[in-house]
Every structure is written in C-alpha cells, then in structure tokens.
C-alpha cells in the first residue's frame, strides 16, 4: 500500500489537474440514484457488494450507517479485488466490525495473495459473487428478504444479479450503480 496507481485520465481529472493555484472552479453534485430506500424496517438486513472503484460509494453508505446513524440492523460488506494492494480501507472496515457486532466485512481476492498472507489479512480467494454465495447466501434462511446494494464492474454486477435472481430475490431488493456501462 502507499503510492499512486496509474489510471487513464477522465474528463474531470484532466480538468482539475489543468487548474493553477488561485483558479476559481464551480462544483455541484454528486448526482445519482444509488441510495438506500426510505422506510426500510430497522431489522431488514443489508448486504453491500462491491468491486474495484465501487469501494467509494460503498464506503460512503457504510460510514453513514455506522458513524452517523449508529445502525443496529444486520449489515455485511463483501468486497472483491484482484489483490490486497487494490483493496483500500480494509483496516477501517475491520475497526467498524470491532465497534459494531452487527457488521461483517468480507474480503474476496481473485486468487491467493502472498502479500495479504504475509500481512495476516483475512480474505477468501475467489470472485466476490462466488465467495458471497458459498460463505453466506447458500445457507441463508431468507436471502429474498435482504436488500442488496452493489457497485462495481459490469461483469461483477451481472454475475451477482444472476445469482440473486437464481435465489429468488425480487428485483426491487437489488439496487446497484452500474457505472461501467
């Protein structure tokens, strides 16, 4: 960890980095439709599933739920990455787990990761949708009663939606920001 990851520049990033100290800019937003529904029962389980850059909105929702609302509802976060170095905020989520017994963080790495092993970081090798199914949903009493919030690459979203559909989860319980399409 540490350092920067080289990524292709986006329109906004290019604009921001072209500014000079003292330049005035106007910012608005964020605008989007990825948010928790109002009036959910306090006991309804929330399952967050993220991958790649999907960490940012997931973290925002989870910080609000636990640091602002101090929610007591059952919540889990299943995050998939290629390697530990591509999984930010792991320590932060473990700290929330310690403070809130109703929260579980689960890290899925695509393959065994020597760096994670050396650091003693707990993870499950595999794709996040398979890890979620094998380690939780296949034995869940009522997966159709949970609310699922996802943000990540299109292939991840499609795999999770198919799995949830196969489990009989109604589409209104599946919320996602498909930023890759």
Task: Tell where the protein language model's regions lie, with residue ranges.
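Ferredoxin-reductase
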Residues: 1-23, 81-83, 108-112
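Phosphate- and divalent-cation-binding pockets in alpha/beta enzyme and binding domains
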Residues: 35, 57-60, 159-160
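Conserved beta-strand elements of the Class I
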Residues: 45-49, 147-149
């Amino acid at each position: 960890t540490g350092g920067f990851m080289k990524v292709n520049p986006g329109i906004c990033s290019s604009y921001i980095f072209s500014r000079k100290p003292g330049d005035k800019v106007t910012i608005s937003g964020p605008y989007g439709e990825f948010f928790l529904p109002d009036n959910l029962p306090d006991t309804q389980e929330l399952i967050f599933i993220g991958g790649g850059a999907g960490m940012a909105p997931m973290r925002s929702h989870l910080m609000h739920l636990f640091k602002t609302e101090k929610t007591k509802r059952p919540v889990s976060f299943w995050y998939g990455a290629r390697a530990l170095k591509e999984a930010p905020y792991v320590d932060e989520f473990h700290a929330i787990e310690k403070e809130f017994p109703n929260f579980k963080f689960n890290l899925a790495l695509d393959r065994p990761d020597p760096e994670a092993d050396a650091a003693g970081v707990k993870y499950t090798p595999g794709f996040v949708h398979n890890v979620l199914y094998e380690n939780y949903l296949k034995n869940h009493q009522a997966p159709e009663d949970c609310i699922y919030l996802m943000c990540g690459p299109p292939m991840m979203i499609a795999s999770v939606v198919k799995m949830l559909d196969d489990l009989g989860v109604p589409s209104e319980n599946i919320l996602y920001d498909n930023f890759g399409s």
